Amino acid sequence: GNKKCRIYAVCGVSQTPKIRNIERGIMSKGNMEIRKSTREDIKQIMAIFTTAKEYMAAHGNKTQWGDGYPGEEILKTDIDAGNSYVIVNNGMIVGTFSFIIGEEPTYQVIKNGKWTDDRLYGTIHRLASSGIVKGIARACFEYCIKQIDYIRIDTHKDNISMQTAIERFGFHKCGNIYVKGGAERIAYDYIS
């Protein structure tokens, strides 16, 4: 993989009562466009996941996306549910994420803190960049906050790149949550 790439892997961003028109599904930012993923995008998205895993491993985060996660089956499930998105720059897929409005089961229990609000939220998962262009995380966050005004997200304690992107955008650190299997994640939320 490209050693200069900046890859972000994200688990969990949540939603708010002000749900905006997510069905349109396309937002442009400069040369970047965000659209819903299709099954035709799977090969490119899986390549981005591979690049993200390589980046994370090379930067001290060897365990966040282990054991084949995220795999093609979860990606197909996201696509079929309308929750998978790609970020396209000049016709090329340069990033991907999952965005789900509604309750995230792993967010029901939070330790060492609390959520800012208990209203409806959107959750960002599986955010990854090809490393070809900068600003993928910011583009994702800006898109999601236009869909609903309350977002939640979580990341691994070793994913310093993602923590930096989350905090730079203005997310508030809320505490710790535990994903399926019991692994701890740092939990954040953002209200626009």
Regions found by a protein language model. Name each.
Residues 86, 92-102:
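Conserved beta-strand in the GNAT
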Residues 33-47:
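A short beta-loop-alpha structural element at the N-terminal edge
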Residues 158-175, 183:
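Conserved active-site alpha-helix within GNAT-family acetyltransferase domains
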Residues 73-86, 103-105:
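A short helix-loop-beta-strand connector motif used in the catalytic cores of GNAT acetyltransferases and
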Residues 132-146, 164-168:
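Conserved acetyl-CoA-binding loop-helix of GNAT-fold acetyltransferases
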